[in-house]
Amino acid sequence: MKKLLFILLIGLCAGTNAADNFAKDKLVAWCVVPFDAKQRGPAERAAMLKQLGLKRVAYDWRTQHVKEFEEEILQYKKHGLEFFAFWKGHEEAFRLFEKHKIHPQIWRTLRSPQADSQEARVAAAAQTMLPLVQRTKELGCKLGLYNHGGWGGEPANLVAVCQYLHKHHNAKHVGIVYNLHHGHGHIADWEKSLRQMKPYLLCLNLNGMNDGAEPKILQLGRGQHEATMITAIRKSGYAGPIGILDHRNDTDTEIALKENLEGLQKILK
């Protein structure tokens, strides 16, 4: 009887943890810098995110934002936000991470090299990542292989490259950042793809999902498939980070995030 009660309690706790990652203050805001129609600066952006109740940010950038890197870090600290992830990598940012003692995930697209066999492609893709694998290890940062289409965006290939780096380069800090807006080809087999990737997932970014990616970027709750896909995520026991997007150049980031927060809440009810 005691053993049965213990198993039930463990299951209940696991379910609670999986649900907690959908709480507003656990969600990661993504694609909120260059895509913001209002072109906010660091202080305005941090204040807006805090006002929305979001506390984690994955920072994407363009060349014009390099001079703002440190101010972005300082404003996040001031407003109680977690600098959760950083796009691609930049030595000035790495210097600042060391200075301010922060360790965000680094997200980088996995390339799609040509080779004569699947094994050779996996090895070649891993090879292209090695400088960043080493640099992130030195910084104490996790490295997320990011799906952005092509061979390198396929769940099975992301997993294979992760496994290769873990086995041959002792790179246990490498995982997967999977984006639904680059994953329309896996709507039909989402449960299988999620099961493959789950042990390696560092973040899972949500999006409204229609057949044929029409449109590619869509608010949560307005698509045909994201409710079913989110249900699968919750049932899988995945308890890691969940991201929501702006990614719409013509829209105020605050509005885009609000729409996704509202859509997500309707799905979760």
Ranges and model annotations:
Residues 31, 58, 84-87, 105-106, ...:
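Conserved beta-strand positions in the central sheet of alpha/beta enzyme cores
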Residues 4-13:
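Sec-dependent N-terminal signal peptides
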Residues 65-72, 154:
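Active-site-adjacent beta->alpha loops and helix N-cap segments on the catalytic face
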Residues 42-65, 84:
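Catalytic domains of carbohydrate-active enzymes, especially glycoside hydrolases
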Residues 82-83, 87-176:
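Active-site acidic/histidine proton-transfer and metal-coordination neighborhood
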Residues 20-28, 40-50, 131-134, 138-140, ...:
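Histidine-acidic metal/acid-base catalytic patches
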Residues 34-36, 63, 89-91, 110-114, ...:
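Active-site-proximal loop/turn and secondary-structure-junction residues that shape catalytic pockets
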Residues 28-41, 88, 113-122, 218:
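Active-site mouth loops of central-metabolism enzymes
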